[in-house]
Amino acid sequence: MTYRLTRDDFERVVDREFAFLRDAGFGGAAVERRDDGFLAGFDRADLGVRVHCDLDCEDMMTVVARPLLGRELLLETIHALNVGDSRYPSGGGGSWRSLAAFEERLALEATLLRENLTAAAGNDALYEEASGRA
C-alpha cells in the first residue's frame, strides 16, 4: 500500500520546510506538475542562486547552482532518496509509504540545504579574501 502524494501536499510541505529561503530573500516556489512528479523552484537573481526541489518516483534532489564565469557551478546536489529504500517505492509521480515519510524526508532536505548554503557562503568569503576582493 502506498500513498500518492498530491500537489497540495507537496506545496504545503515545501512552503513549511523551505520558508527560510523566503526569509533570505528568495522568490519563487511556484509548483509545476510534471508527468513524473512535481518541481518547485526558489531563486535570487541578485546572487545568481537557484534552488530546485524536484520530486519524481525515482529520485528527489535539491540542487544549488550559481553562475561562475558564464558557466553554472554545481555547489551541491543532495540525493535524498534511495530507490532501494522500502519506504519510498517506485511507482510513478511521488508514491510514498505515507505522507509522514515524505514530510520527514523533506525536513531532512531543508536541514541539509541550510547547512550547505551556510558552508557555501563561508567558502565565498574565503574565496573573496584569498583573491584580494574582500
What is the meaning of each model-derived region?
Residues 1-17, 28-134:
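Intrinsically disordered, low-complexity regulatory regions enriched in serine/threonine/proline
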